[in-house]
Amino acid sequence: MSSSNYDVKTGNFLCGFDKFPPEKETDKNRGLTEGFTEIISMAGVPGTIEIASGYYIEASLINQLIQIIGVDVFIKSYFFNLGTKFLESKLLNIIADPELAFQLFRNIEINFQIRNLKGKQSLLGNIQLLLLDYLEKRCEKLIENNKLREVNEILKIYEQMLITPEKLKIMDKNPDDYEGLVESITKFKNLQEKLSPKLVNIEAQDSVRK
């Protein structure tokens, strides 16, 4: 754990998305804590080679989530030790399924716990696939409100944050062990193709503003 503080009143140790001892499942998520701590660290040290980070996968998943619910939500949850409940509430505004949001964060935590596991595994691929469901709904809502440029920027950034087989090779991991990962990349490309006809009016919007 990269940092922590002790709450004298409650007798709990607090750190990012974690509370010790935890009272409920949403009180603990070391995967999120380490991932967001890594993002903060890399932001503070320009030139850091991100893919060399020990928590690159966790940071990448969080960066995907940031494009969906915003960085301010993470900052508040992290520094005020809110667990994952606040994050879940924001996801419910996109897809109204509490179990889906809960399971997403459980999977991120479990994926962190088994990060050194060798052999076939499907959690990482499933997480990226699920995040893309949220991304699609988020983009559709923005398009409904004619926020085309915002959607365009989100898709550009999101593509850079995807965990790909090529990145896993650089991390000395076998991409063939990560079931569902290739499918998640394909799903993102299909989403790009689906939304691209709706984004052709961005230049027209800019002309109107001028």
What are these regions (language model features)?
Residues 1-5:
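Short alpha-helix carrying the canonical HExxH Zn2+-binding catalytic motif
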Residues 6, 10-69:
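Post-HExxH zinc-binding segment in Zn-dependent metallohydrolases
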Residues 52-207:
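Pan-zinc metallopeptidase signature
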